[in-house]
Design a protein with these regions (language model features):
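A conserved amphipathic terminal alpha-helix motif
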Residues: 98-126
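Residues at secondary-structure transition points
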Residues: 12, 53, 75, 79, ...
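Hydrophobic ligand-binding cavity/cleft-lining segments
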Residues: 1-35
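Structured surface interface patches that mediate subunit assembly and partner/cofactor docking
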Residues: 26, 39-40, 115-116
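Hydrophobic-ligand binding "helix-grip"
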Residues: 32-35, 42-101, 123
Length: 126
């Protein structure tokens, strides 16, 4: 198994970045529509377009600091963890998308896709 690990500086306070990760309307602006709620045990789906509805479950929540959930249960069976750290006048957002099969198309595809998605977060908050 292998992971994708990235970080992105966002010139907004952690509370705003947290909303981009946990507010369904904001999440849909930069990534995918879904009924996410930052509550441990909450089961939700993310609409990944041609890849279909992906089931998820919230594993860990530390408001404005950490959010972790399963992603694509029964298909990819990966875990997405977001970590937020205040930095200067904004937030350093860390992403760890863990549990990919080494050399898989999903690892390559998501590894190529995540950097552009992370850059969209700041625009979604504008």
């Amino acid at each position: 198994m292998t992971d994708i690990e990235l970080d992105q500086f966002i010139a907004r306070e952690p509370a705003a970045v947290w909303r981009a990760l946990t507010d369904p309307e904001l999440l849909a602006r930069w990534w995918a529509a879904g009924d996410i709620k930052p509550i441990v045990g909450h089961r939700f789906t993310l609409d990944m377009g041609s890849w279909g509805q992906q089931p998820c479950e919230v594993l860990e929540v530390d408001p404005e600091r950490l959010l972790s959930y399963t992603f694509a249960e029964g298909d990819l069976d990966t875990t997405i963890t977001w970590r937020l750290e205040p930095e200067g006048g904004g937030t350093r957002l860390f992403l760890r998308h863990a549990g990919f099969v080494e050399g898989s198309a999903a690892l390559t595809g998501m590894g190529n896709g995540w950097p552009g998605l992370l850059r969209r977060i700041e625009h979604a908050l504008a």
